[in-house]
UniProtKB/Swiss-Prot annotation:
Organism: Drosophila pseudoobscura pseudoobscura (Fruit fly)
Family according to the record: Belongs to the universal ribosomal protein uL22 family.
Keyword list, A-Z: Mitochondrion, Ribonucleoprotein, Ribosomal protein, Transit peptide
Gene that this sequence comes from: mRpL22
Name used for this protein in its record: Large ribosomal subunit protein uL22m
Main location per the UniProt record: mitochondrion
Signal peptide extent: none
Top-rank lineage group of the source organism: Eukaryota
Keyword Calcium belongs to the record: no
Length: 233
């Protein structure tokens, strides 16, 4: 049956004049190109990776330009110091917004590099097998370059990660087809990564220093002795 249909179509094309054949092919090619471009727009309208760069689509992101206050700290003008005061450490704040990664997953990487020197953080991030580690590493490298070029830091290795945290970005909701005509909801999450590098060597204990059992006992005993007795003189 397919052979018969193919032969009939070939006979119809042979019988058609050349001018009509050219018009038919031109009219067929124009809608195909139009449909192709329209299909591309329709496909991208359901996803966040529109455009060649894979960034957020401009039509989706009109009313949200990302966080703005974090970079304002770089423009802070501090008052002059007295000669006997300790020199104020230089710092630089940097961020990367709208990263196509879950903020819950990025939190582990951001908390991992807190309190490390820049060289140690970059070295450790090479062994973190997570997608967000690449963005964190690139952001720290950009902040390191900014500190040397714009914030009068003499040695780029004399920096440590003073702050490193994550913010929640935009969440786009989509649909995923399931079997038997059903569908499921999909969330395309984005996050913002913030980092602040400070000049100098990192502290020995970035978080609270762990206490020995004797210190814990003394602290508990002090709390017990400082209790207030209700309705007493």
């Amino acid at each position: 049956m397919h052979t018969v249909i193919r032969q009939m179509s070939q006979l119809r094309l042979q019988a058609m004049p050349s001018s009509a054949l050219l018009k038919a092919t031109a009219s067929a090619s124009a809608p195909s190109a139009l449909d192709h471009s329209g299909a591309a727009v329709n496909h991208h309208s359901l996803h966040t990776a529109a455009g060649s760069g894979g960034a957020l689509c401009a039509s989706w992101n009109k009313h949200n330009n990302g966080p703005r206050k974090w970079l304002v700290y770089n423009k802070t003008v501090h008052p002059p110091q007295q000669p006997d005061e300790e020199p104020r450490k230089a710092y630089v704040c940097h961020m990367r917004s709208n990263i196509k990664y879950s903020p819950d997953k990025m939190w582990y990487i951001a908390a991992f590099v807190r309190g490390m020197s820049v060289d140690e953080a970059l070295k450790q991030l090479n062994f973190v097998l997570k997608k967000g580690a690449t963005d964190v590493k690139e952001t720290i490298l950009e902040a390191q370059e900014m500190a040397v070029q714009r914030h009068n830091v003499e040695y780029k290795s004399n920096l440590w990660v003073a702050e490193s945290f994550v913010g929640k970005g935009r969440v786009f909701k989509g649909m995923r087809r399931h079997a038997r005509g059903r569908f499921g909801q999909v969330e395309y999450k984005h996050c913002h990564y913030f980092v602040r590098l400070e000049e100098g060597q990192p502290p020995e204990h970035y978080y609270q220093e762990p206490q020995t059992p004797e210190q814990q006992y003394e602290h508990w005993l002090e709390q017990m002795r400082s209790r207030k007795v209700i309705n007493s003189l």
